[in-house]
Protein backbone atom coordinates (compact mmCIF):
# COMPACT_ATOMS: atom_id res chain seq x y z
CA UNK A 1 0.00 0.00 0.00
CA UNK A 2 2.83 2.39 0.90
CA UNK A 3 4.59 1.65 -2.41
CA UNK A 4 1.38 2.38 -4.31
CA UNK A 5 0.89 5.71 -2.51
CA UNK A 6 4.55 6.61 -3.09
CA UNK A 7 4.15 5.86 -6.80
CA UNK A 8 1.07 8.09 -7.04
CA UNK A 9 2.87 10.89 -5.16
CA UNK A 10 5.88 10.69 -7.50
CA UNK A 11 3.60 10.78 -10.56
CA UNK A 12 1.73 13.83 -9.17
CA UNK A 13 4.98 15.69 -8.39
CA UNK A 14 6.30 14.87 -11.88
CA UNK A 15 3.17 16.22 -13.59
CA UNK A 16 3.17 19.39 -11.47
CA UNK A 17 6.88 20.03 -12.04
CA UNK A 18 6.52 19.47 -15.79
CA UNK A 19 3.73 22.03 -16.02
CA UNK A 20 5.35 24.51 -13.62
CA UNK A 21 8.83 24.71 -15.16
CA UNK A 22 8.24 23.01 -18.48
CA UNK A 23 11.45 22.15 -20.36
CA UNK A 24 9.30 21.27 -23.38
CA UNK A 25 7.97 24.78 -24.03
CA UNK A 26 7.30 25.22 -27.78
CA UNK A 27 9.72 27.46 -29.67
CA UNK A 28 6.77 29.37 -31.08
CA UNK A 29 3.11 29.46 -30.12
CA UNK A 30 1.92 27.40 -33.08
CA UNK A 31 4.70 24.80 -32.94
CA UNK A 32 3.51 22.11 -30.56
CA UNK A 33 6.11 19.52 -29.50
CA UNK A 34 5.02 15.90 -29.47
CA UNK A 35 7.35 14.54 -26.77
CA UNK A 36 4.68 14.83 -24.08
CA UNK A 37 1.76 14.37 -26.44
CA UNK A 38 1.02 18.09 -26.46
CA UNK A 39 -1.09 17.91 -29.61
CA UNK A 40 -3.81 16.28 -27.53
CA UNK A 41 -3.27 18.26 -24.30
CA UNK A 42 -6.74 19.80 -24.63
CA UNK A 43 -9.17 16.89 -24.40
CA UNK A 44 -12.49 16.71 -26.23
CA UNK A 45 -14.26 17.04 -22.89
CA UNK A 46 -12.40 20.29 -22.21
CA UNK A 47 -13.13 21.59 -25.72
CA UNK A 48 -16.84 20.86 -25.23
CA UNK A 49 -16.83 22.67 -21.87
CA UNK A 50 -15.22 25.75 -23.46
CA UNK A 51 -17.71 25.64 -26.34
CA UNK A 52 -20.59 25.61 -23.85
CA UNK A 53 -19.12 28.51 -21.86
CA UNK A 54 -18.65 30.64 -25.00
CA UNK A 55 -22.14 29.73 -26.22
CA UNK A 56 -23.56 30.84 -22.86
CA UNK A 57 -22.03 34.29 -23.42
CA UNK A 58 -23.48 34.60 -26.92
CA UNK A 59 -26.90 33.45 -25.70
CA UNK A 60 -26.81 35.89 -22.80
CA UNK A 61 -25.92 38.79 -25.10
CA UNK A 62 -28.33 37.56 -27.79
CA UNK A 63 -25.56 37.61 -30.38
CA UNK A 64 -25.48 35.07 -33.18
CA UNK A 65 -22.25 33.25 -33.98
CA UNK A 66 -21.97 35.18 -37.22
CA UNK A 67 -21.91 38.52 -35.40
CA UNK A 68 -19.72 37.33 -32.58
CA UNK A 69 -16.72 39.32 -33.81
CA UNK A 70 -18.03 42.27 -31.79
CA UNK A 71 -17.37 40.10 -28.70
CA UNK A 72 -20.59 40.85 -26.85
CA UNK A 73 -20.32 42.61 -23.52
CA UNK A 74 -17.75 40.30 -21.93
CA UNK A 75 -14.61 42.26 -20.94
CA UNK A 76 -12.12 39.47 -21.79
CA UNK A 77 -13.50 39.14 -25.31
CA UNK A 78 -13.64 42.90 -25.87
CA UNK A 79 -10.07 43.39 -24.67
CA UNK A 80 -8.69 40.47 -26.69
CA UNK A 81 -10.73 41.09 -29.82
CA UNK A 82 -7.77 41.71 -32.11
CA UNK A 83 -7.07 38.04 -32.86
CA UNK A 84 -10.57 36.81 -33.68
CA UNK A 85 -10.16 34.83 -36.92
CA UNK A 86 -12.67 36.79 -39.01
CA UNK A 87 -11.16 40.15 -38.16
CA UNK A 88 -7.43 39.44 -37.81
CA UNK A 89 -5.07 40.59 -40.57
CA UNK A 90 -1.41 39.84 -41.13
CA UNK A 91 0.55 42.42 -39.20
CA UNK A 92 3.51 44.49 -40.29
CA UNK A 93 5.93 42.83 -37.84
CA UNK A 94 9.33 42.19 -39.37
CA UNK A 95 12.48 40.43 -38.28
CA UNK A 96 15.76 42.23 -38.85
CA UNK A 97 19.22 40.89 -39.55
CA UNK A 98 22.04 41.14 -37.03
CA UNK A 99 24.60 43.93 -37.32
CA UNK A 100 26.94 44.18 -39.29
CA UNK A 101 25.26 42.39 -42.22
CA UNK A 102 24.10 45.59 -43.92
CA UNK A 103 24.41 44.16 -47.43
CA UNK A 104 21.38 41.91 -46.87
CA UNK A 105 17.85 43.30 -47.10
CA UNK A 106 16.94 44.20 -43.54
CA UNK A 107 13.41 42.84 -43.54
CA UNK A 108 11.81 39.45 -44.01
CA UNK A 109 8.27 39.42 -45.36
CA UNK A 110 5.55 38.33 -42.98
CA UNK A 111 4.40 34.80 -43.61
CA UNK A 112 0.80 34.62 -44.74
CA UNK A 113 0.00 31.40 -42.88
CA UNK A 114 -2.04 31.48 -39.68
CA UNK A 115 -2.84 28.90 -37.03
CA UNK A 116 -5.39 28.41 -34.27
CA UNK A 117 -3.44 27.58 -31.08
CA UNK A 118 -5.10 25.48 -28.38
CA UNK A 119 -2.59 26.15 -25.61
CA UNK A 120 0.28 28.51 -24.92
CA UNK A 121 2.54 30.01 -22.26
CA UNK A 122 2.00 33.39 -20.67
CA UNK A 123 4.82 35.87 -20.19
CA UNK A 124 5.08 34.41 -16.67
CA UNK A 125 5.76 30.93 -18.17
CA UNK A 126 2.38 29.58 -17.08
CA UNK A 127 0.58 27.05 -19.27
CA UNK A 128 -2.82 28.26 -20.50
CA UNK A 129 -5.71 26.84 -22.52
CA UNK A 130 -6.45 29.23 -25.38
CA UNK A 131 -10.14 29.57 -26.19
CA UNK A 132 -11.19 28.04 -29.50
CA UNK A 133 -14.95 27.59 -29.94
CA UNK A 134 -15.69 27.05 -33.64
CA UNK A 135 -19.23 25.72 -33.06
CA UNK A 136 -20.09 28.87 -31.09
CA UNK A 137 -18.55 31.00 -33.84
CA UNK A 138 -15.41 32.11 -32.00
CA UNK A 139 -11.89 31.23 -33.15
CA UNK A 140 -8.57 32.97 -32.44
CA UNK A 141 -5.88 33.09 -35.12
CA UNK A 142 -2.20 33.93 -34.81
CA UNK A 143 0.01 34.71 -37.80
CA UNK A 144 3.26 32.79 -38.21
CA UNK A 145 6.21 35.11 -38.85
CA UNK A 146 9.40 34.19 -40.67
CA UNK A 147 12.75 35.09 -39.16
CA UNK A 148 16.24 35.42 -40.57
CA UNK A 149 18.94 32.95 -39.58
CA UNK A 150 22.18 34.47 -38.30
CA UNK A 151 24.29 35.74 -41.22
CA UNK A 152 21.83 34.43 -43.78
CA UNK A 153 20.02 36.12 -46.63
CA UNK A 154 17.17 33.61 -46.38
CA UNK A 155 13.95 34.17 -44.49
CA UNK A 156 12.81 31.09 -42.63
CA UNK A 157 11.18 29.86 -39.42
CA UNK A 158 14.49 29.28 -37.62
CA UNK A 159 17.28 31.59 -36.47
CA UNK A 160 17.25 34.67 -34.30
CA UNK A 161 16.38 38.32 -34.57
CA UNK A 162 17.34 41.26 -32.39
CA UNK A 163 13.82 42.15 -31.24
CA UNK A 164 12.25 41.27 -27.91
CA UNK A 165 9.97 38.30 -27.54
CA UNK A 166 6.69 38.93 -29.24
CA UNK A 167 3.46 38.55 -27.28
CA UNK A 168 -0.22 38.52 -28.20
CA UNK A 169 -3.24 39.06 -25.97
CA UNK A 170 -5.55 36.07 -26.26
CA UNK A 171 -8.70 34.89 -24.49
CA UNK A 172 -7.81 32.03 -22.12
CA UNK A 173 -10.03 29.86 -19.96
CA UNK A 174 -9.66 28.73 -16.35
CA UNK A 175 -11.26 25.29 -16.15
CA UNK A 176 -11.42 25.18 -12.35
CA UNK A 177 -13.13 28.55 -11.94
CA UNK A 178 -15.00 28.57 -15.25
CA UNK A 179 -13.70 32.09 -15.98
CA UNK A 180 -12.36 33.77 -19.14
CA UNK A 181 -9.23 35.95 -19.04
CA UNK A 182 -7.42 38.16 -21.52
CA UNK A 183 -3.71 37.38 -21.09
CA UNK A 184 -0.32 38.00 -22.68
CA UNK A 185 0.82 34.82 -24.45
CA UNK A 186 4.25 34.36 -26.02
CA UNK A 187 4.24 34.07 -29.79
CA UNK A 188 7.89 33.65 -30.81
CA UNK A 189 10.43 32.54 -28.24
CA UNK A 190 13.54 31.13 -29.93
CA UNK A 191 13.09 33.30 -33.01
CA UNK A 192 11.83 36.62 -31.62
CA UNK A 193 9.91 38.99 -33.85
CA UNK A 194 9.21 42.65 -33.26
CA UNK A 195 5.97 43.10 -31.32
From Swiss-Prot:
Name the UniProt record assigns to this protein: Coagulogen
Source superkingdom: Eukaryota
Stated family: Belongs to the coagulin family.
Entries under Pfam families matching the protein: Coagulin (PF02035)
Subunit and interaction comment: Coagulogen is cleaved after Arg-38 and Arg-66 by a clotting enzyme contained in the hemocyte and activated by a bacterial endotoxin (lipopolysaccharide). This cleavage releases the peptide C and leaves 2 chains of coagulin, A and B, linked by two disulfide bonds. Coagulin molecules interlink to form a gel.
Disulfide bond positions: 28-188, 30-115, 80-182, 85-141, 95-189, 108-161, 147-191, 155-193
Tissue expression pattern: Hemolymph.
Subcellular location field: Secreted
Keywords linked to the UniProt accession: Disulfide bond, Hemolymph clotting, Secreted, Signal
First and last residue of the signal peptide: 1-20
Database matches in SUPFAM superfamilies: Cystine-knot cytokines (SSF57501)
Function: Coagulogen is a gel-forming protein of hemolymph; it hinders the spread of invaders by immobilizing them.
InterPro entries assigned to the protein according to its UniProt record, in alphabetical order: Coagulin (IPR000275), Cystine-knot_cytokine (IPR029034)
Record's GO cellular component terms: extracellular region
UniProt-listed GO biological process terms: hemolymph coagulation
